[in-house]
Amino acid sequence: MSIIERLKRALPARLKASTDRSSSFDETERPDIGFVACIEGGVLEAQALLLFESIRLYTGRFRNCSLYALSPRAGYEISTQARRRLDDLEVHYLDTVLNTECPEYGSANRVAAAAHIEGIYSHNILVILDSDTLFLGEPSKFILPPDIDAAVRPVDAKGISTAGTNDPFDAYWRNLCNCCDVDYDEITWSESFIDHKRIKANYNGGLVVVRSELGIMRRWADFFFKSIRQGIRPPSDDYSFRAGAGWVEQAASRLWGSNQAALSLAIWSTTRQVKELPPTYNYPLHLHDHVDRAVAKSVFPKLLHLHYHWLFAEDALSTNPLFLRGGPLSVDQRNWLRSATPLS
């Protein structure tokens, strides 16, 4: 049985139960928020459908918000079954080709997709998501207070971030700032989540929450694609590694992290009203064993949104920490994910 067939069979009863649990929410209380994620043929198709289903099932007052699925690259069409499934979940699907300048880099899809939705749909808040994430609870912090314009999580590890003048990636950040006419010194300092390095603010692109009226997503796309046109890339070695959608080959690995650097510049050139979300959001499940033990003990049972990367693949499912006793899953969620996985 395909993943789409499994999801389709599992959804009706759970959706009814979720509707019953959410009946205390008046429709007028529904936040004006749009959720945006990419979908393409292959494993990304299954991941995106699981994400959208999790929103409809487990996000409380957010469960009826607008959902947008985009296929921004040519040649990555989704299946007819997936189209029907998106219709069942009331997801707006757009297959306009948007990523024409950097199609070798899959992460560029979310940049183009976010800018496109921000430009054509009107929402108070946009939530940009990686497809290999899902929700387990109501993400109440998506309702931004008046003094906050963007909510994000720091990068998991330092990676291509800069720690300052003597850092091997500092020249890249300064060149990027010059390209985008952003003052390097105005970018605040932050700390990476796993390895606790002091770095210029750099955010994980798997979850980005912004006020759409500010145009941060369009600025993100402007900055990123301008840097691509000017050949500004972080120093890198040619190597392949595993990510949520599969193995990242050399052409994409040379650009890895560059879209997130552009995001930081887009945010800090627009506003100083930025909040870092707690680690119950966009939790890096693939790095669970590397999270500070005290933090993991406190946070892991209460996860609201997690980034599982490849851990629902058949070869990784048996060691997926999400299914550990004492973890964040309810009985219903455990059964739901057991019936929906492995993803392929």
State the predicted function of each range.
Residues 2-344:
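Glycosyltransferase catalytic domains, chiefly GT-A lineage
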